[in-house]
């Protein structure tokens, strides 16, 4: 409406309240036409997706996670088809729990490949780290070290093995795990 009024030659004169508050059909058509044009359609790489899904399905057991990921893939396809903004509709942050050797790291790697194939991630690579890879021994260095690992993982997956170890030693003046957690949470909110 504002653009229509600004482009109208008659707007050089004083406009009435009615003119300023009237929305025309053309205004609405323009707004929705513009929003349709701005919708992002993900490019899905069907070959990469099939390979990643096959790799997931070859894993022994884990039927629940396989079903969850399959349903997520179908939902992302559906949203992409109807023009919903897939990238901002989902939180891709996940927590994998389980005993050692149950495949958490393997599933995280495969999920990165699936998200890349779906066009959600640029690179789909997995950066694996643990407490030692995030926490430094001096004040102020942990945030820098953690941010560096996060930057390395951008466009892919950051997998923090035994992330609970970041909370160990809470309250100790020599423990910087809380600083790493704060840095991670801030970047998760921002990116």
Q: Which sequence ranges carry the predicted segments?
A:
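Pre-Walker A (pre-P-loop) alpha-helix and adjacent loop at the N terminus of AAA/AAA+ ATPase modules
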Residues: 49-94, 113
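Conserved catalytic/switch belt of AAA+ P-loop NTPases
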Residues: 164-191
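Conserved C-terminal helix/linker of AAA+ ATPases
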Residues: 5-45
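Walker A/P-loop
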Residues: 89-124, 148-154
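Conserved Walker B
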Residues: 131-132, 162-164
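The conserved phosphate-sensing helix
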Residues: 1-7, 63
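Short glycine-rich substrate-engagement loop in P-loop NTPases that contacts/grips substrate
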Residues: 122-153, 178
């Amino acid at each position: 409406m504002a653009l229509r009024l600004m482009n109208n030659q008659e707007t050089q004169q004083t406009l009435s309240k009615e003119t300023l508050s009237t929305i025309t059909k053309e205004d609405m058509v323009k707004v929705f036409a513009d929003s349709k044009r701005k919708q992002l359609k993900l490019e899905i790489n069907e070959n990469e997706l099939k390979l990643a899904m096959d790799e997931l399905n070859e894993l022994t057991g884990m039927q629940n996670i396989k079903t969850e990921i399959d349903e997520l893939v179908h939902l992302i396809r559906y949203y992409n088809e109807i023009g919903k903004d897939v990238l901002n509709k989902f939180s891709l942050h996940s927590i994998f729990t389980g005993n050692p050797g149950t495949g958490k790291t393997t599933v995280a790697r495969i999920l990165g490949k699936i998200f890349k194939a779906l066009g959600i991630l640029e690179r789909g690579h997995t950066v694996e780290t643990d407490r030692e890879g995030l926490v430094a021994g001096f004040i102020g260095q942990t945030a820098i070290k953690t941010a560096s690992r996060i930057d390395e993982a951008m466009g892919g997956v950051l997998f923090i093995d035994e992330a609970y170890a970041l909370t160990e030693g809470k309250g100790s003046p020599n423990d910087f795990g809380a600083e790493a957690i704060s840095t991670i949470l801030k970047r998760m909110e921002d990116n």
